[in-house]
Amino acid sequence: MSRIGKLPIDISKDVKLAFSDSILSVQGPLGKLSRRIMPCVNLEITDSCIIVMRNDESGTARSAHGLTRTLVSNMVNGVTKGFQKSLEINGVGYRAEVKGSELVLSLGYSHPVVFTIPAGVTIEVDKLTKVVVKGFDKELVGETAAKIRSFRPPEPYKGKGVKYADETILRKAGKTGKK
């Protein structure tokens, strides 16, 4: 039995679940998410919890057991609490601002980088150097934050660039010069 897969998923009262034709739909106060569940895994939905069970003991069923439980748990948590990812911008003249449905980044290039904010995600900018990506779909929030970071990843010598708030940058020493 999978250590993660055997844990039940608690459901709050304001979450509505629908499971038919191997598609799970979860609706809550923040939004609605749907996901196809693998056929080797089955869901048992009660009033207060979801239990993920596998249909057989094959290798795919065992590996999908814990994965499916985590994905369903992320769906339930997303529509109730939501997810967020924080980014920091370091560098002289590096800044960000939200204009309508676009995030405009000044990252030391000759032109500003314009990023269109995807549907289902909100972006807040605090003090021009802190960007917070929020949403109810964990996968979309992480993907959006990774795209913003990829415009100027932090470099190891001065640490300039866009980094996650909880990320540590391994710093390198510069050239020592000729002796």
From Swiss-Prot:
Keywords: Ribonucleoprotein, Ribosomal protein, RNA-binding, rRNA-binding. InterPro entries: Ribosomal_uL6-like, Ribosomal_uL6-like_a/b-dom_sf, Ribosomal_uL6_a/b-dom, Ribosomal_uL6_bac-type, Ribosomal_uL6_CS. Gene3D superfamilies: Ribosomal protein L6, alpha-beta domain. PROSITE patterns: RIBOSOMAL_L6_1 (PS00525). It comes from the Bacteria. GO terms for cellular component: cytosolic large ribosomal subunit. Part of the 50S ribosomal subunit. Belongs to the universal ribosomal protein uL6 family. This protein binds to the 23S rRNA, and is important in its secondary structure. It is located near the subunit interface in the base of the L7/L12 stalk, and near the tRNA binding site of the peptidyltransferase center. This is Large ribosomal subunit protein uL6. It comes from Pelobacter propionicus (strain DSM 2379 / NBRC 103807 / OttBd1). The gene is rplF.
